[in-house]
Amino acid sequence: QYILLIDGVENIIPQCTRYRVLNKAEQLRKHGFEVKVVNLSDFQLSMAQNASYIIIYRSPISPELLRLCHLAKEYGKPVFFDIDDLVFDTVYTDQLSYTQGLNSVEKGNYDAGVRNYGYMLENCDGAITSTNQLQEELYKYQSKVLLNRNLASDDLIAISSQYIKDYSQTSDIVKIGYF
């Protein structure tokens, strides 16, 4: 058995795939779980057959994912929708600077995409998100909402640790910085 992670972004937004899919898979593996990652466009229902949990990251509803949710429920396999932006309810879309410049057709298409994320969220057993604010908002739509913050990968930590400054030396010099 394994945790199946379905990436709806498919690395089109690399930082989303990195933090919400690949780093999550690495984190789960470090805790002893077997994890399989698949892009949404490559997903087949048979991939979920031996999964114990299914996490769907930022994927719009589709007939195949809806069938997955129904089958998973039938077989007692929890499905979580992972989302890290307010892109699951159109109540927020008028407030975005991005949508201000869209014509009515473009705005309609954008809102349709947001509604499709919302429908996917509704069909899952719970949600996973990255911030306290999103967690609170998601409680309006799901009773089970897990907080899993974005994490640095082991590779990034290894690279960063090479540049850690030694602050153990004391000095009488006071340094002031303006940010």
State what each model feature region is:
Residues 58-74, 82-94:
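An aromatic- and histidine-rich active-site surface loop
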Residues 4-5, 167-179:
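Conserved donor-binding/catalytic core segment of Leloir-type glycosyltransferases
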Residues 49, 70-74, 104-126:
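Membrane-proximal helix-turn-helix segments that form the acceptor-binding/catalytic region
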Residues 53-57, 80-82, 128, 177:
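Structural motif
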Residues 122-166, 175:
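Donor nucleotide-sugar binding/catalytic pocket of nucleotide-sugar-dependent glycosyltransferases
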Residues 81-114, 155-160, 169-172:
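Acceptor-binding helix/loop patch of EC 2.4 sugar-transfer enzymes
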Residues 13, 45-47, 62-65, 87-91, ...:
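Short catalytic/ligand-binding loop motif for oxyanion handling, primarily in non-cytosolic enzymes
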Residues 1-56, 60:
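N-terminal pre-catalytic "stem/leader" segment of glycosyltransferase-like enzymes
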